[in-house]
A protein has these predicted regions:
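Conserved class I S-adenosyl-L-methionine
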Residues: 1-40, 42-51, 58, 143-170
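Class I SAM-dependent methyltransferase SAM/SAH-binding core
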Residues: 52-98
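A short acidic, Gly/Pro-enriched loop at the edge of an enzyme's catalytic core
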Residues: 100-109
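A short glycine-rich, Lys/Arg-flanked "PGG" loop and its adjoining helix->strand segment in the class I
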Residues: 126-138
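Short alpha-helix
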Residues: 183-201, 207
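A C-terminal cap/extension of S-adenosyl-L-methionine-dependent methyltransferases
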Residues: 206-260
């Protein structure tokens, strides 16, 4: 995995985690994740692409044992400064090296939030899913939040800017996305692609849109000063979240896969 996000590490929380849009999208993920955790016997969790550790800390505070990994040493350093929870361990790990860093460990759940897996090629994603199966306990689960190809917000945004070449950019491979000054090669995957890649080892349990009405984070400057509009969009999002078919049109989607 080439993208390290070292440059983005220092400013990531300010540019996404603590923003209005970032908080709303994260709370949507937590609402679904909380239900998954309550319905299953979960003790040990592996997080992939943990970034600055926001989700790992939240999970650890729910009394789960969490191993949180990221390829970026600077992201891991930022995360480690946030907490000293005994049931949380941060490690620098390249996702493409799995399962080598965990030769004797099994996890009940593997979690990856907000498009970390979009830094993989389709081939790498398929290999990750195969490797993840070997790291999970019997009936273990993958909970992944991924960016799809057909995000309506993005298409409308580029249409409004008359940037017609970018309207369907998510359908291309290795799209260069700027993340806080760092150019990251990004690939987008619709739910059907993920379920197909995972079909040998997993069955789908849950599929939900994340950010169908709530916009992408790069629109934060526009929406930050319009709290009433954000409130309306949030209410609409709660309705949209009931309809899995909207997932490929949202900014992200949450997919839960259970090991066969």
């Amino acid at each position: 995995m080439n993208a390290s996000f070292d440059i983005a590490a220092a400013n990531y929380d300010n540019s996404f985690t603590h923003t209005v849009i970032g908080k709303l999208q994260r709370n949507l993920v937590y609402r679904h994740l909380r239900g998954i955790l309550e319905e299953n016997r979960i003790q040990n969790i592996l997080e992939i692409n943990c970034g600055t550790g926001e989700d790992a800390i939240w999970l650890a505070k729910q009394n789960y044992t969490v191993t949180a990994t990221d390829i970026s040493p600077l992201m891991v350093a930022v995360a480690e400064k946030k907490t000293n929870l005994e049931n949380l361990n941060f490690r620098q790990v390249d996702i493409n090296r799995l399962p080598q860093p965990f030769p004797d460990e099994k996890f009940d759940l593997i979690f990856s939030n907000f498009g970390g897996l979009n830094c993989l090629t389709k081939t790498e994603l398929g290999q990750f899913l195969k490797n993840a199966s070997g790291l999970l306990t019997q009936n273990g689960q993958l909970v992944l939040v991924i960016m799809p190809k057909n995000t309506l917000w993005e298409q409308l945004y580029f249409l409004a800017k008359a940037d017609f070449k970018s309207v369907f950019r998510r359908k291309k491979e290795n799209v260069v996305a700027n993340v806080d000054g760092e150019n990251i090669k990004t690939n987008y995957f619709n739910p059907k692609e993920v379920t197909h890649l995972a079909s040998a080892d997993f069955r789908i349990r849950l599929l939900k849109p994340i950010g169908f009405f709530i916009p992408p984070s790069y629109l934060e400057p526009f929406f930050r000063s319009r709290p009433k509009l954000v409130s309306v969009l949030h209410s609409l999002e709660n309705t949209a979240g009931k309809h899995s078919f909207l997932s490929k049109y949202a900014d992200h989607y949450l997919i839960t896969l259970q090991k066969k």
